[in-house]
Design a protein with these regions (language model features):
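Short, surface-exposed loop or secondary-structure junction motifs
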Residues: 1-122
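Structured C-terminal helix/loop/strand segments within mature extracytoplasmic catalytic/sensor domains
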Residues: 124-179
Length: 179
C-alpha cells in the first residue's frame, strides 16, 4: 500500500502464522491462552473487513501508520492522505459539552476512530486495542509511541493511562539532561 505497510492484514496468511503471538486472558493474575497463535481467529477470513475489529499489524507497520499521521499525511516524502483529512480525523469531532465521563474516553475527545487529548493533553491522538496495545502521536512534541501487549481485558493493568504519561516524562527528563 501507499504507506509501505507490508505486514498488515484482515486475514493473516499462513506464511506469517509464525509471527503471530498468542492472546491471553488474565484471570486472578494467571495468563490463560485465549487465542493461540497457531489457530488464531485472524487466520480465518473475516465476515466483514474493518479496522476497528480485526485489522492485524506488526509493530513496524503500525509505526509507519503513526509516522504518516505525525507527518500530517506524508511518509517517506510522499503524501498519502491530505493534511485536512489527517487534521479532521485526529481532531475532536464531538460537539462542545458532550459528557465523556462514563465512557472509555473519559476526559478526552474522539476523532475518527481514536482518542483525542483535550486540555493539558491537547495535541495527542491515539487508541488502545482490546488486547492492551496502545499507540499515539503527540503533535506538540513531535513524537509517536506504541506498546504492544496481548492480554484481555485491556484494563487488567493500568497501561492505557500510564504509558503515555511515562513516555512524556521520559522525553522531558531527556531534555533536562541534554540542557
Amino acid at each position: 500500500g501507499p504507506t509501505g505497510m507490508t505486514s498488515t492484514y484482515f486475514q493473516v496468511p499462513q506464511s506469517d502464522v509464525g509471527r503471530l503471538t498468542t492472546n491471553y486472558a488474565v484471570a486472578k493474575g494467571v495468563l490463560l491462552p485465549l487465542d493461540p497463535a497457531r489457530s488464531s481467529i485472524y487466520l480465518d477470513k473475516p465476515a466483514f473487513p474493518f479496522g476497528g475489529a480485526g485489522l492485524v499489524s506488526s509493530p513496524a507497520d503500525y509505526d509507519r501508520f503513526l509516522t504518516m499521521l505525525l507527518g500530517y499525511g506524508v511518509i517517506d516524502g510522499r503524501r498519502v492522505m491530505s493534511e485536512a483529512a489527517v487534521r479532521m480525523g485526529t481532531g475532536n469531532l464531538l460537539p462542545a459539552g458532550v459528557d465523556t465521563s462514563k465512557t472509555m474516553i473519559s476526559g478526552a475527545g474522539f476523532g475518527a476512530g481514536g482518542r483525542v487529548g483535550v486540555g493539558i493533553d491537547a495535541g495527542t491522538y491515539g487508541w488502545g486495542g482490546a488486547a492492551g496495545t496502545i499507540a499515539f502521536v503527540n503533535y506538540r512534541v513531535k513524537n509517536r509511541a506504541s506498546l504492544f501487549t496481548q492480554y484481555m481485558p485491556d484494563n487488567t493493568y493500568p497501561i492505557h493511562a500510564e504509558f503515555p504519561k511515562a513516555v512524556i516524562a521520559d522525553l522531558l527528563a531527556g531534555r533536562k539532561v541534554a540542557a
